[in-house]
Structure formats: structure tokens, C-alpha cells
């Protein structure tokens, strides 16, 4: 059965059992790595949760300037299933661009032939959905370093804002404000491994 999404005793969150999955709306300016300077996403969690064993870790990362859906878990098997290249879990990003789209980006990103600067292996095909002249949704199935930003750079543009809206079929809940988190239900976790629907 699903766990309640939030349990409290005297107003303080109760420690959930092992195998928890948290959905966080990552705010701007927070990092996912202890190796970087600045506020960590883990700082949002109750202090004692950060001392759990096994430790809570992010499932993949979002860079400091990227906002949106970030999952955290103490389930190592789930973590590796989600980030495994064999799973092809899709990630949907909303990108705000410095310059209007030219109309050529969709074919370039879908070609499976785009090679990012400094790399040898082409990117897997990605799907571009135009929202406005300077805004687009991009669905990718890989997690290369700063991939979305570098893809638009390869197309002659610059990403000014980047927000992850979906991971597989799991959509960032509309009622989860930046910096807020809650426990994911079993159905929500299962939806990670389904195909995303259009969120435009």
C-alpha cells in the first residue's frame, strides 16, 4: 500500500521507512553535489534525514541554474534503474531561450547525428516541441553533462532558463512550489518508467 505523502508528529515530519522516494521542486541556485559550493538540495530536508543509512541521494542531478522535478531516494536499486542508459527514461525540460528558434532545431535534435562539442558519440534522438518563439519543451533520454544547454548552443542559441517538468510519465505536481517536497506514492514511482505525455 502507498505510504501517506507526509506524516507528522507534533508538527515535525516522521521518519519514513527505508525505500522512500521524495519529489522536490528544486529551486534556482541550489546544487545537488557536495563538491560544489553553495546551498545543497539536501539542506531542505529534516536534519536527521541527512544522517539516514542508507543515505538519501538524488536520482541524477540538476545543475545550479536548473529548476524543477528532482527525485531523492535511499533505494540504490531504484536509483540505478532510473539513471541506467538501458532504461531510456525520458526527461522533459522547458527551456527559455535568448533568441527565437529558427525552425531547424527540431530536425537537428531528432536526427541522432548531433555530436556535442568535445564529444565523439552522437546524441540519441530528442524531441523538440515549440511553445513560443523563445520557449520550447525538449525530451531527452540521456543525461550527459549540461546536455540541454549544450544542444541549444550547438544550434546557435543560449538557454536562459531551464526547468525539468517530467521524468518518464511522472509530472512535477502543480501544487509543489519551489523548495517544497513530498513523498512520492507507489503509483508515481511506477510512472517514472512509462512514456511521458505532452506537457505543453
Model feature map: region roles:
Residues 1-200:
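Basic, flexible Lys/Arg- and Gly-enriched helix-loop patches that mediate nucleic-acid binding at interfaces
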Amino acid at each position: 500500500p502507498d505510504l501517506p505523502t507526509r506524516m507528522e508528529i507534533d508538527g515535525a515530519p516522521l521518519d519514513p521507512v527505508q525505500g522512500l522516494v521524495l519529489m522536490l521542486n528544486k529551486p534556482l541556485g541550489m546544487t545537488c553535489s557536495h563538491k560544489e559550493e553553495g546551498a545543497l538540495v539536501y539542506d531542505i530536508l529534516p536534519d536527521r534525514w541527512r544522517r539516514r543509512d542508507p543515505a538519501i541521494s538524488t536520482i541524477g542531478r540538476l545543475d545550479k541554474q536548473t529548476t524543477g522535478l528532482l527525485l531523492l531516494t535511499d533505494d540504490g536499486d531504484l536509483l540505478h534503474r532510473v539513471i541506467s542508459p538501458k532504461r531510456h527514461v525520458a526527461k522533459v525540460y522547458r527551456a527559455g531561450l535568448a533568441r527565437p528558434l529558427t525552425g531547424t532545431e527540431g530536425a537537428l535534435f531528432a536526427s541522432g547525428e548531433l555530436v556535442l562539442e568535445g564529444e565523439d558519440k552522437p546524441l540519441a534522438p530528442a524531441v523538440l516541441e515549440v511553445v513560443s518563439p523563445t520557449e520550447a519543451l525538449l525530451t531527452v533520454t540521456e543525461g550527459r553533462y549540461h546536455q540541454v544547454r549544450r544542444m541549444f548552443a550547438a544550434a546557435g542559441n543560449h538557454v536562459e532558463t531551464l526547468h525539468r517538468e517530467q521524468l518518464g510519465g511522472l509530472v512535477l505536481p502543480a501544487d509543489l512550489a519551489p523548495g517544497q517536497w513530498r513523498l512520492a506514492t507507489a503509483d508515481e514511482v511506477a510512472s517514472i518508467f512509462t512514456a511521458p505525455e505532452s506537457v505543453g
